[in-house]
From Swiss-Prot:
InterPro entries per UniProt: LOR, LOR_sf, Tubby-like_C
Protein name per UniProt: Protein LURP-one-related 14
Top-level taxon: Eukaryota
General function of this protein: Might be related to the phospholipid scramblase and tubby-like superfamily of membrane tethered transcription factors.
Entries under Gene3D superfamilies matching the protein: LURP1-related
Annotated family: Belongs to the LOR family.
Length: 204
């Protein structure tokens, strides 16, 4: 984080690259994320820019334990894989580059801040800080309210992104998110975090 304490990541601040530099833009980004059930066990997400261009697509298991999700670019190339780590008091996911499961390809780990909470609250640990048993200091934190799957993402005290839930045909498994990504922030990282938070909190 910059030396001067601020409440929001801004133009000119250092890039926050978690997945890849190619997903960091020097300006704020407004994204629309659409989620739809594909069949009984699978659903998918599509991410669009304000012009309607497809940027990312995520598919995988909608229910169950040890879930796996895959993020791809518009051409279908795999960017990263998200895997839920079985039964635990605190939901935990590991995210690797491509289809890998290898430790050296680990991008980040996501874990619920508390075992039981009515609000969105998750911690993100980068590989050099992913031994959550030895440290309680996370690299990023996402927190939200009680009523829906809306939350904000912080690096220390600085806001780096915001996710807003919007109602759609909820009974049909369709709903959207509006995402605001601050300048120089890796939007693929923010979208992956959104999907894992949604999976943790939604069973529809």
């Amino acid at each position: 984080m910059p030396k001067n304490k601020k409440t929001e990541w801004q133009v000119g601040d250092p890039a926050i690259s978690v997945v890849s530099d190619q997903f960091c833009n020097p300006y704020p980004m407004d994204l629309l994320v659409k989620r739809k059930v594909q069949n009984f066990s699978k659903d998918y997400y599509e991410v669009f820019d304000p012009s309607g261009n497809l940027l990312l697509q995520i598919d995988g298991q909608a229910w169950g334990f040890n879930r796996k999700r895959v993020m791809r670019d518009p051409a279908g190339f795999t960017i990263l894989s998200m895997r839920q780590k079985g039964l635990a008091l605190k939901n935990k996911w590991e995210v690797h580059g491509g289809e890998s499961k290898e430790r050296e390809d680990l991008l980040f780990t996501v874990q619920q801040s508390q075992a039981v909470s009515l609000k969105t609250s998750v911690d993100v640990f980068l590989p050099e800080n992913n031994n959550v048993k030895k440290t309680n200091t996370c690299d990023f934190h996402a927190s939200g309210g009680y009523s829906n799957i809306s939350f904000k993402v912080f690096k220390a005290d600085a806001l780096i992104a915001g996710v807003g839930f919007t109602w759609g045909s909820f009974c049909k498994g369709k709903y959207n998110f509006k995402v605001r990504v601050n300048p120089e922030v890796d939007y693929a990282f923010i979208i992956a975090l959104l999907v894992m938070v949604d999976d943790n909190e939604n069973w529809c």
